[in-house]
Swiss-Prot record:
Gene: HBB
Name recorded for this polypeptide: Hemoglobin subunit beta
Modified residues (Blocked amino end (Thr)): 1
Disulfide bond found in the keyword field: no
One GO MF term: haptoglobin binding
Subunit (UniProt): Heterotetramer of two alpha chains and two beta chains.
Length: 146
């Protein structure tokens, strides 16, 4: 993926402002609520019986933070996203058997959550840069799938 200076700016300047625990936890929780079939991959995370239970589930919050921290690797290695996510792709494909479509869903949710948290800052150009990034990460995470 080729990145323009403007795209890099939109991504890195926003990343520096992100509260990873808050945004990550909220993004993962929202994905599980909006797309309930994704909950099957988190059956050992405790109570997922309601939106409130999911939003306040400590394991979901912690895993969301972990997911967004790993997403930060893409921000730091924008020119090497495929290599950066090779091991995670293998894990999600061979061990966890995650539906690769879920990576796109979570990326879309992340953009929505960022837009909610940062108000008017996310312009259409900002959104285009972030969409390109989440798409690149989702693609990298699917490379081990056949």
């Amino acid at each position: 993926t080729h990145w323009t200076a403007e795209e890099r700016h939109y991504i890195t300047s926003m990343w520096d402002k992100i509260n990873v625990a808050e945004i990550g936890g909220e993004s993962l929780a929202r994905m599980l609520i909006v797309y309930p079939w994704t909950q099957k991959f988190f059956s050992d995370f405790g109570n997922l019986t309601s939106s409130s239970a999911i939003m306040h589930n400590v394991k979901i919050q912690e895993h969301g933070k972990k997911v967004l921290n790993s997403f930060g690797s893409a921000v730091k290695n924008m020119d090497h996203i495929k290599e950066t996510f090779a091991d995670l792709s293998k894990l999600h494909c061979e061990t966890l058997h995650v539906d690769p479509e879920n990576f796109k869903l979570l990326g879309s949710i992340l953009i929505i959550v960022l837009a909610m948290h940062f108000g008017k800052e996310p312009t259409p150009t900002w959104q285009a840069a972030w969409q390109k990034l989440v798409s690149a990460v989702a693609h990298a995470l699917t490379l081990q799938y056949h």
